[in-house]
Regions:
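Glycine-rich anion-binding surface patch
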Residues: 1-109
Length: 109
C-alpha cells in the first residue's frame, strides 16, 4: 500500500502532471498535493475535478457497483478494485480507486 505522497507522485507521473509534491500542516488539517503553479495544488484524492481529469487523461474505464469501484486501464492492463461498505463515501472511494490505478501505472513508468 502506497502513502498519500507516493500515490500523488506516481499518479502525477502517469498523468504527466508537472510539479513537486507539497505538504503543509495547519492547526486542523493537512494541505497536500502536487504544486502545479499559480498557487494551485493538484490532489485527485480530495478533488473530484482532478480525479476526473486524471481518469480521462489516462483513458481509464470506471465501473461503479454497490460493493465497490472497479477501475481498469485497457492500455496497460492495470486494474484496481476499491471495496465500498454500506454508508461509506462513494465519491471518496471512487477518487481513491482512480488514483491507485494511476499510481500503479506511474510506478511502472
Amino acid at each position: 500500500m502506497m502513502t498519500n505522497r507516493e500515490l500523488l507522485i506516481n499518479a502525477a507521473r502517469a498523468g504527466e502532471i508537472a510539479g513537486k509534491y507539497y505538504i503543509a500542516y495547519g492547526e486542523r488539517d493537512v494541505n497536500e498535493g502536487i504544486d502545479i503553479g499559480g498557487g494551485r495544488l493538484w490532489n485527485p484524492l480530495i478533488n473530484n475535478a482532478d480525479a476526473f481529469s486524471l481518469m480521462v487523461r489516462l483513458y481509464l474505464d470506471l465501473d461503479v457497483r454497490d460493493y465497490g469501484i472497479l477501475v481498469n486501464s485497457p492500455d496497460t492492463g492495470v486494474r484496481y478494485k476499491q471495496l465500498v461498505a454500506r454508508g461509506e463515501d462513494r465519491e471518496k472511494a471512487t477518487r481513491l480507486a482512480i488514483v491507485n490505478c494511476a499510481a500503479i501505472i506511474g510506478e511502472n513508468l
